[in-house]
């Protein structure tokens, strides 16, 4: 375990290797129960009858709109999951997408998805570390990180790498967790449980996030707090795994499953737990 800092307090957090192992082991059961978008959803109205699949696609669409790409552009997807957002982006905007992940099983599934969609000629995925990208300078027209940068032990370094491989004038889109205000007591315990259980190595306020983006020599063009739209994901995740208990217990064990469900339900009671979309460009 490493130390990860949030609001000045050191807490136990998984190592990068533990994050990789988590995705190697947990991607398949999570995708079966939550869906093939391995990220939060976007609900315009928390009470609306909108499925998880539709809500997670909606969040992908918000990122597509934020990215501002043109037909033929080359896009880097940092933390590609099993490829559904990248395929949706490529289809919607007629772009070429290169996705990366530190999970080889995810990369294999993502490439299979691109092939099945008939997009293997312009959507590809590979094993790579976001903090040491294996690409030339200025080799992409756009970069996005959809709910992945919180896994980085050094978010600033990852952002600098994203900026390095982006051409001048290129755009960046980020979706990620933030803390809207400092937390203490039971709220801090809930946040710390999420950090430890969710592989969260970088978590802080919106101002801190924007500062990291600017220090990567990128210009912040928009910041949208979508905490209210993303928050239903917490309870819905807990409900989905509770309803699938018989499928998950053999893999996670009863204690591990109970801990996961409690973590998501606990974080749902923390209004300071937020979610943000950040747009940027390279001068």
Curated annotation (Swiss-Prot):
InterPro entries (UniProt xref): Erg6_SMT_methyltransf (IPR050447), MeTfrase_dom (IPR020803), Methyltransf_11 (IPR013216), SAM-dependent_MTases_sf (IPR029063)
Summary of pH dependence: Optimum pH is 6.5-8.
Reactions catalysed: 4'-demethylrebeccamycin + S-adenosyl-L-methionine = rebeccamycin + S-adenosyl-L-homocysteine + H(+)
UniProt keyword Cell membrane present: no
Keywords from the UniProt entry: Methyltransferase, S-adenosyl-L-methionine, Transferase
Its biological purpose: Glycosyl O-methyltransferase that catalyzes the final step in the biosynthesis of rebeccamycin, an indolocarbazole alkaloid that inhibits topoisomerase 1. Has broad substrate specificity and functions as glycosyl O-methyltransferase on a number of rebeccamycin analogs.
Protein name, entry field: Demethylrebeccamycin-D-glucose O-methyltransferase
Organism listed in the record: Lentzea aerocolonigenes
Gene designation: rebM
């Amino acid at each position: 375990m490493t130390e990860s800092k949030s609001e000045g307090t050191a807490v136990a957090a998984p190592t990068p290797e533990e994050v990789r192992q988590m995705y190697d082991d947990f991607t398949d059961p999570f995708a079966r129960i939550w869906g093939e978008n391995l990220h939060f959803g976007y609900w315009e109205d928390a009470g609306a009858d909108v499925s998880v699949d539709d809500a997670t696609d909606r969040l992908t669409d918000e990122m597509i709109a934020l990215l501002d790409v043109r037909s033929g552009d080359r896009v880097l997807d940092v933390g590609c999951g099993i490829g559904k957002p990248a395929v949706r982006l490529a289809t919607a905007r007629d772009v070429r997408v290169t996705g990366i992940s530190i999970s080889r099983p995810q990369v294999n599934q993502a490439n299979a998805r691109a092939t099945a969609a008939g997009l293997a000629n312009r959507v590809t995925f590979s094993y790579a570390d976001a903090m040491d990208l294996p690409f030339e300078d200025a080799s992409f027209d756009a970069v996005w990180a959809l709910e992945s940068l919180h896994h980085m032990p050094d978010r600033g370094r990852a952002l600098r790498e994203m900026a390095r491989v982006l051409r001048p004038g290129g755009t960046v889109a980020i979706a990620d967790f933030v803390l809207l205000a400092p937390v203490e007591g039971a709220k801090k315990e809930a946040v710390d449980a999420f950090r430890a259980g969710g592989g969260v190595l970088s978590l802080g306020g919106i101002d801190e996030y924007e500062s990291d983006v600017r220090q990567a020599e990128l210009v912040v063009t928009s910041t949208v707090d979508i905490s209210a739209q993303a928050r239903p994901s917490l309870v819905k995740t807990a409900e989905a795994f509770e309803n699938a208990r018989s499928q998950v217990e053999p893999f996670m064990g009863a204690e591990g499953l109970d801990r996961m469900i409690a973590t998501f339900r606990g974080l749902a009671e923390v209004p300071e737990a937020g979610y943000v979309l950040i747009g940027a460009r390279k001068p």
